[in-house]
C-alpha cells in the first residue's frame, strides 16, 4: 500500500530546545506529517469517515507543539507520532519531520531538524 496523506509546512511557535534562548524566546517549528493510510475506501465512498481527517490531525499537532516543552525535538516528534498512531486507527505508519529554521546556533543553513518514522502497532 503506497497511499499517503500529508500535511506539509505547518508552522507553530513553541519553546522546545536545550538552550536557554530557545526556552525563553521560543521559535517557529516547521512540521511535516506523512501518514500511510489505505485510501481506497474513501476513494470509493467519498465519505470522510473512511479516511483520516487531516483537519483533526492539524489541531492535534498544533496542540502538542504549542503545549508542554520538550528539551529535544526528537522527543517532540515521538509525542506527535505516538498521539497520531494511538488516535487514528486507519494510520499504518506516521512520519514526522520537524525543522528549526533559525535555531540559536552559529552557521548558515536553511534549517536543522529531525525525521522519524513509526509504525502503528
Curated annotation (Swiss-Prot):
This protein's pathway: Cofactor biosynthesis; tetrahydrofolate biosynthesis; 2-amino-4-hydroxy-6-hydroxymethyl-7,8-dihydropteridine diphosphate from 7,8-dihydroneopterin triphosphate: step 3/4
Q: Which domain of life is it from?
A: Bacteria
Supply one GO molecular-function term: isomerase activity
A GO cellular component annotation here is: cytoplasm
Locate the residues binding substrate.
22, 54, 73-74
- Tell me which residues this entry annotates as catalytic: 100
EC numbers, comma separated: 4.1.2.25, 5.1.99.8
Q: Which Pfam families match?
A: FolB
Report whether Lyase shows up as a keyword of the record: yes
An example Gene Ontology biological process: tetrahydrofolate biosynthetic process
Chemical reaction(s) catalysed: 7,8-dihydroneopterin = 6-hydroxymethyl-7,8-dihydropterin + glycolaldehyde; 7,8-dihydroneopterin = 7,8-dihydromonapterin
Q: Cite the entry's keywords alphabetically.
A: Folate biosynthesis, Isomerase, Lyase
Q: Partners and quaternary state?
A: Homooctamer. Four molecules assemble into a ring, and two rings come together to give a cylinder with a hole of at least 13 a diameter.
Any idea what this protein is called?
Dihydroneopterin aldolase
Gene source species: Staphylococcus epidermidis (strain ATCC 35984 / DSM 28319 / BCRC 17069 / CCUG 31568 / BM 3577 / RP62A)
Gene name as annotated:
folB
Amino acid at each position: 500500500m503506497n497511499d499517503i496523506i500529508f500535511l506539509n509546512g505547518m508552522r507553530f511557535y513553541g519553546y522546545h530546545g536545550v538552550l536557554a534562548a530557545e526556552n525563553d524566546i521560543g521559535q517557529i517549528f516547521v512540521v511535516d506529517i506523512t501518514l500511510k493510510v489505505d485510501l481506497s475506501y474513501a476513494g470509493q465512498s467519498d465519505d470522510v469517515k473512511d479516511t483520516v481527517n487531516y483537519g483533526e490531525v492539524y489541531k492535534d499537532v498544533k496542540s502538542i507543539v504549542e503545549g508542554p516543552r520538550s528539551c529535544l525535538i526528537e522527543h517532540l516528534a515521538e509525542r506527535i507520532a505516538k498521539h497520531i498512531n494511538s488516535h487514528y486507527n486507519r494510520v499504518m505508519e506516521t512520519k514526522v519531520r520537524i525543522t528549526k529554521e533559525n535555531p540559536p546556533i552559529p552557521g548558515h543553513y536553511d534549517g536543522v531538524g529531525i525525521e522519524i518514522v513509526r509504525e502503528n502497532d
